Amino acid sequence: MQTQDIIESKLDKCRKGIYGPPIGKKCIAFIDDLNMPNTETYGAQPPIEILRQYMDHSGWFELKEKTFLKIEDMMYVAAMGPPGGGRTFITPRFLRWFNVISVTEFDNEAMMGIFSSIMKHVFEKNQVPTNIKGQQANAIQATMDIYESALQSLLPTPSKSHYLFNLRDFGRVVMGMCMANTFIMTEQAQFVRLWCHEVMRVFYDRLTDDRDRLWLIELLRERVKTRFGQDFDKICKHLQTDENGDAIGIPQARRLLFGDFEFPDSKRTYEEMKNPDNVIQVCNTYLEEYNSVSKKPMELVLFLFMIEHITRICRVLRSPGGNALLVGVGGSGRQSCTRLAASIMDYTVVEIEISKTYGKT
């Protein structure tokens, strides 16, 4: 019913019993994730069946009066992924109406060309130093290594169903690097740490157990050496909490922070925040400002683990089209972190309250 209502809302009544687009125009209905609807007990997929009815009979039955509505000058363009992983099979009776075009995965050369062009454009626009600009190809190649390794090793399971990676994740690493003010970087180590941070935000933050996290850190260590010619433990030495610390592991890698709010009185620049204690103090200042104007002040004790999540949310909020899904048990501070991060980024949080009168308006 919802599918039918959506399509009918975009059509005009041409004459009695006939609907279509405005005179002289064609209506193209784009249907994304065509094979997403689940099958019912007997194998039917209602959204698919109503679409097929139009293809078979050039219309469907009106829901109230039960009269047949003929639809003219409308065509479908649909997209879908291969069946599996929650995607179902499309019946041959419906599929026969389409010209099927298979869009294969990009090869490595195409991916290198796409993302290298993006990074090159940003670097030239920001007048990045030559020694940093020369690392862009290494960054793209290293990101491709991480992406391909994640596809092969971080496979989805019933307990890790969210271990799904696609080309958008590759792009998020590149876009994250483009957000940074690379024009103020003077050392290659700064650029490599930026790359490590963006890889961790895209891939590491999705991991749910320490075995997978250690696997990714070891992969980072290897790629930093082979692609950038740098020593991972050496360039991240400042993350150690003691002088005789071991190799960089999970506790140290978590201290690699980037953000644009460490210095509130200056222009916001996305850069490394090397002093976690100073970041905690700054966040406490933002918390005081939030409580001074909020009707529901938050009594929070900020500590490093919480700051890590706040910086991650801030990064998502400053990313174009950024959306965050915070997964955790109740009472773990997801809402508090989000409210404080939104305040830091000068956003207002609006919470939808479900009630009996809740509707589209």
Located regions from the model:
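Flexible beta-alpha connector loops of hexameric P-loop NTPases
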Residues: M1, M36-Q45, I101, L300-V301, ...
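Conserved catalytic/switch belt of AAA+ P-loop NTPases
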Residues: I6-K16, K26, F30-I71, M75-V77, ...
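Conserved nucleotide-binding/hydrolysis micro-motifs of P-loop NTPases
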Residues: L34-P37, Y76, G81-G86, E105-M111, ...
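Short regulatory helix/loop adjacent to the ATP-binding pocket of P-loop NTPases
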Residues: K66, P82-W97
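Walker A/P-loop nucleotide-binding motif
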Residues: R318-C337
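Alpha-helical lid/collar subdomain of P-loop NTPases
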Residues: E72-V77, R96-N99, F106-P320, M345
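AAA+/P-loop NTPase substrate/partner-engagement loops
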Residues: M1-C14, P22-K25, F106, A110, ...
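Conserved AAA+ ATPase "SRH/arginine-finger" region at the nucleotide-binding site
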Residues: M1, F68, M80-P82, N99-M111, ...
